[in-house]
UniProtKB/Swiss-Prot annotation:
This is Histone H3.2. It comes from Cricetulus longicaudatus (Long-tailed dwarf hamster). The modification N6-crotonyllysine is found at residues 5, 10, 19, 24, 28, 57. It is found in: Nucleus; Chromosome. Residues 1-45 are annotated as: Disordered. Its main location: nucleus. Disulfide bonds: none annotated.
Amino acid sequence: MARTKQTARKSTGGKAPRKQLATKAARKSAPATGGVKKPHRYRPGTVTLREIRRYQKSTELLIRKLPFQRLVREIAQDFKTDLRFQSSAVMALQEASEAYLVGLFEDTNLCAIHAKRVTIMPKDIQLARRIRGERA
């Protein structure tokens, strides 16, 4: 076959690497050589929602037993010294306290949602207690 002369044509954006790609490749290779890999972080709110679902499923007590027991003894000290408690009495107090707090936080969350917010504030707790009739 006979050789023919090539005519010049415009390039249609061939395969030449662009500068942006070169810098991206350099950025990717830099941490592999000497940098420290960042730890994985979940987006804000993801872990919170996971914890909410986990604690709503569970039935175990959320406050540690010994700190709660110390608090009960400290409060009881104001009324009478040298009081003794059965372990079942402390457990009953803890069950009742946690049930009360969970209910209060549910009502507090409803107050915050009513105010078109997702963050609970002290004024929400005050409103919830006032509606319940616990505080004038």
